[in-house]
């Protein structure tokens, strides 16, 4: 049931074209704000992640630093995504039309939950997809930490939807 509600929220947000119509500068600014919050709270997040997955605190803090770098990297790409013509033969036309897919359903593995989570969110964010993301059942706390950061920087409701559960049930749905 929760997965259905999350999907409906993501679909509503996508249909409102919140990310699709957000200009590149605003997308970039929000992603950089997420990166900044991740850096500011890396020690707190690192301790939480260490408690839930058993890695050293240093490894976990480094994972949060890497996640911040991921958001910064994709923030720099927001104004590089464009529709364009591709050179081709004299009697053909070859072009790329970039458009968002809709709702992206993502399942995060347990081994690098913060790093992989950030990549999944950032990649979908820049192209305008909304996201339903299922974190690993073995590492649920770090995804709640992420959720708080998204709220703190003002990510619009429905853009990123975190759903906990077991892969056998939630992931299959």
Language-model segments: residues:
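Rossmann-like NAD(P) dinucleotide-binding subdomain of oxidoreductase/dehydrogenase enzymes
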Residues: 50, 82-173
């Amino acid at each position: 049931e929760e997965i259905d509600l999350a999907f409906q929220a993501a679909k509503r947000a996508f249909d409102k074209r919140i990310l699709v119509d957000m200009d590149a500068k605003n997308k970039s600014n929000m992603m950089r704000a997420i990166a900044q919050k991740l850096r500011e709270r890396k020690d707190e997040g690192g301790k939480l992640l260490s408690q839930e997955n058993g890695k050293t605190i240093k490894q976990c803090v480094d994972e949060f630093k890497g996640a911040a770098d991921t958001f910064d990297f994709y923030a720099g790409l927001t104004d590089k995504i464009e529709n364009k013509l591709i050179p081709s033969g004299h009697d053909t036309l070859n072009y790329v039309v970039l458009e968002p897919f809709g709702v992206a359903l993502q399942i995060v593995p347990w081994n690098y939950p913060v790093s992989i989570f950030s990549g999944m969110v950032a990649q979908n964010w820049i192209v305008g997809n909304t996201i339903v993301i299922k974190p690993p059942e073995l590492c649920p706390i770090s995804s709640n930490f992420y959720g708080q950061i998204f709220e703190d920087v003002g990510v619009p409701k429905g853009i990123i939807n975190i759903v906990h559960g077991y892969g056998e049930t939630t992931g299959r749905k």
